[in-house]
Amino acid sequence: MAPKVALFLALSLLFAATAHGCEPNCSGPVVPTPPVVPTPSSHSHGRCPIDALKLKVCAKVLGLVKVGLPQYEQCCPLLEGLVDLDAALCLCTAIKANVLGIHLNVPLSLNFILNNCGRICPEDFTCPN
């Protein structure tokens, strides 16, 4: 009986050492890379860096036009690469210039489009006159 116990203990120690002893071949813990946050565009100086006429497709996000691709597939890519403040500024420009072809409640429409594109309208933001 004693040889069986000794063999059991020896094998247990061997397996424990093998499981914890992978030092040369073990990879370290995976450290996630921080998300890339675009820097505010310094070239816009209070102007939309994209053509406001292209934002006409954003009327689809409001559910007012239903033709072709799903609403977000045309509007949201136009806002990619812009920080939330620049995206809000561009949409304000489009809404106020009536390039969407409809009269809208600016704050509600702006928030709705930004939220549907995964953006957040800055709390203290108001569309410039």
From Swiss-Prot:
Tissue expression summary: Cortical ground meristem of developing roots.
Q: What does this protein do?
A: Delineates a novel subset of developing cortical cells. It is probably involved in some aspect of transport of molecules to or from the vasculature.
Family, similarity comment: To carrot DC2.15 and PEMB3.
Q: Which cysteines are joined by disulfide bonds?
A: none
Superkingdom, natural source: Eukaryota
Signal sequence span is 1-19
Going by the UniProt annotation, this protein carries glycans at 25
Q: Which organism is it from?
A: Zea mays
Task: Give the sequence repeat ranges.
Answer: 29-34, 35-40
This one is known as Cortical cell-delineating protein
